[in-house]
């Protein structure tokens, strides 16, 4: 697909009638708002995040962190230990977690869905290096990763302007109406699972995004990141997820993101916060917690093993990173045996 020629997302306005917005969300599986979030607040967060990334060696020394000029020698992605080290330093920022609780999103979603909504504890940042396109987030439905209930919603927002060449999200409108999880297969990229493009329609939508623009979509809406084709700029974005209080939340969403890749817990996250207000905020509620469904991850692993046997270099790379991260894990032991390491 040519990302420069994709049709644009339909723009909604926060002031539109809630019945109309809810009908649109039910029909299209998404809502796109211009400048829903405060751009100045996002740019302040951007400086904090990118300053840490520069201190971690990801950005060119001496450049303005706001410009996000990547050092290609530091290139890494989710699944690499060197990525997790810097990522978790960013993850500790109080402002990064606070923005998920902003009234602009919480109040709007509450009005649209007709009930009080909660941001899930596990917040996610996506920090993508330029021209590392093999690791672009593939086509998927969020439910395979975040689970709990179909009736959850992702709020995606770039931290700064994100033109199409920088790799914003693209989605297939109405794809959530299948009302089920589609088949997912092994892939590189965040989550390591992908829907085959031929299993979907070809009506992909995307946009140039400005700071403050926000895309909200259903857990079954098929979407992907477009590749970061910029010459030298990092793509930085937020993935926050919301649900009503009365539906299940999956156990993994109560832990910090990528804590399965490193020794990292909420006490690490909160160590330098200046306020206690949002610490463990979800524990005041009687939440129904569901066990993580391992099915899709197991399918992806088995496919990666089979592909590696057939000489697939991407699958081999995936298994090598797994063994490096967690050499004693059950799947890693099997992978190491196959790899001969």
Model-assigned labels for residue ranges:
Residues 3-10, 59, 221-321, 333-337:
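Non-heme Fe(II)/2-oxoglutarate
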Residues 4, 11, 164-224:
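Double-stranded beta-helix
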Residues 37-39, 126-127, 144, 162-164, ...:
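Short, solvent-exposed loop/turn segments at secondary-structure junctions
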Residues 146-164, 216, 241-244:
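Short, conserved beta-strand element in jelly-roll/cupin
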